[in-house]
């Protein structure tokens, strides 16, 4: 086969082991998964009720325009329908962005470490990837990113809060950054975890009308608890949306996914409860870190914590796994002595912290 040359050296995404597989290997009767930043509280009761009574006609193609969901999200953010695009998770939106803007003659600028799919999709298109190391506290080096831009740059990526560190860039700094980026370069503001930020930042979706080169990406996979439904979306100027729709598959979000997302966004009381629970979980880990001088906890603003224990990451990961908790080894994330742990329920956080204390 005459494969694209850009695929040479790349590998496919390898998901972690299934919980059942880990239990069988280690002889455990229970496992708690804290590796994928899923919502430990599940999803809204309204979503659960719809799931129990769903009558989706699976033989019928879904609404390719996601009309009902589009209206719901439009009303929620006070936007226009043409300022939205819906995709099979933010992963698909990232793929579409790289497809329309990157090729072998272009480059893209991003932080490192950050969400791996920016780099992966850029390399698939054959583009040069310019990675700017995070600052020592895990924050984006925005000045360094600006300096990396040249006439061949077409996309700049900002993950906010950043995955895997959890650092959050406030709105004033985002706007100051946008003011300095040339207007013909797209800035992707990936806000997959924005609903977890406490206190919540003021509404800023309409920044897309001031900065025509901005797209804000969000998802129903995290705080809304719909990871398996695969519904993400982008908010941008109509011209950006028009270009993306040219390459968007016609039926890329499912009927059930659209319906579940509608119910999820309606229940903001559940979202607030999740945000409070998550903030309390972060406080548990902050208190733990204060008790041990050698422990470094990165600023947590998502639904996860990145903890550097000064111990080889695989050792920490294996130790927690053997005790029934699946986490994410920092070795694969650019942090060789750290682990990333999803914030769980209060008792789950306490159990993990107790194990870490024993390890130290």
UniProtKB/Swiss-Prot annotation:
KW Transmembrane helix (keyword) present: no
Keyword Cell membrane: no
GO molecular function: histidinol-phosphate transaminase activity; pyridoxal phosphate binding
Enzyme class: transferase
This enzyme's EC code(s): 2.6.1.9
Reactions mediated catalytically: L-histidinol phosphate + 2-oxoglutarate = 3-(imidazol-4-yl)-2-oxopropyl phosphate + L-glutamate
Keywords: Amino-acid biosynthesis, Aminotransferase, Histidine biosynthesis, Pyridoxal phosphate, Transferase
Superkingdom of the organism of origin: Bacteria
Disulfide bridges in this chain: none
Entry-linked InterPro entries: Aminotransferase_I/II_large, HisP_aminotrans, HistidinolP_aminotransfase, PyrdxlP-dep_Trfase, PyrdxlP-dep_Trfase_major, PyrdxlP-dep_Trfase_small
Modification type N6-(pyridoxal phosphate)lysine: residues: 222
SUPFAM superfamilies: PLP-dependent transferases
Obligatory cofactor(s): pyridoxal 5'-phosphate
Pathway(s) the chain acts in: Amino-acid biosynthesis; L-histidine biosynthesis; L-histidine from 5-phospho-alpha-D-ribose 1-diphosphate: step 7/9
HAMAP family on file: HisC_aminotrans_2
NCBIfam families, alphabetized: hisC
Listed name of the protein: Histidinol-phosphate aminotransferase
Source organism: Listeria monocytogenes serovar 1/2a (strain ATCC BAA-679 / EGD-e)
């Amino acid at each position: 086969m005459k494969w694209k040359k850009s695929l040479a050296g790349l590998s496919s995404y390898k998901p972690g082991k299934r919980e059942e597989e880990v239990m069988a290997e280690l002889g455990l009767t229970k496992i708690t998964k804290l590796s994928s930043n899923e919502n430990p509280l599940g999803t809204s009761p309204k979503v659960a009720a719809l799931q129990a009574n769903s009558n989706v006609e699976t033989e019928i193609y879904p609404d390719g325009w996601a009309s009902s969901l589009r209206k719901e999200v439009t009303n929620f953010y006070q936007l226009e329908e043409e300022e939205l695009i819906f995709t099979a998770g933010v992963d698909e939106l990232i793929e579409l962005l790289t497809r329309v803007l990157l090729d072998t003659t272009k480059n893209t600028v991003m932080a490192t470490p950050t969400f791996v799919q920016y780099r992966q999709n850029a390399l698939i298109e054959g583009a040069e990837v310019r990675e700017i190391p995070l600052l020592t506290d895990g924050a984006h080096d925005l000045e360094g990113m600006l300096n990396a831009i040249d006439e061949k740059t077409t996309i700049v990526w900002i993950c906010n809060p950043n995955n895997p560190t959890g650092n959050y860039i406030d709105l004033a700094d985002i706007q100051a950054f946008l003011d300095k980026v040339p207007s013909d370069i797209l800035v992707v503001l990936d806000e997959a975890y924005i609903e977890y930020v406490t206190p919540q930042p003021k509404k800023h979706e309409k920044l897309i009308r001031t900065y025509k080169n901005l797209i804000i990406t969000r998802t129903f996979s995290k705080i809304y608890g719909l990871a398996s439904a695969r519904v993400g979306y982008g908010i941008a100027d109509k011209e950006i949306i028009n270009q993306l729709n040219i390459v968007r598959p016609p039926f890329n979000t499912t009927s059930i996914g659209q319906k579940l997302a509608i119910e999820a966004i309606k229940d903001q009381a559940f979202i607030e409860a999740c945000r409070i629970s998550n903030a309390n979980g972060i406080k548990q880990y902050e208190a733990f870190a204060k008790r041990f001088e050698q422990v470094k906890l990165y600023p947590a603003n998502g639904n996860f914590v990145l903890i550097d224990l000064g111990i080889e990451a695989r050792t920490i990961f294996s130790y927690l796994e053997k005790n029934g908790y699946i986490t994410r080894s920092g070795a694969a994330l650019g942090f060789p002595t750290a682990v990333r742990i999803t914030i769980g329920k209060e008792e789950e956080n306490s159990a993990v912290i107790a194990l870490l204390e024993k390890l130290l």
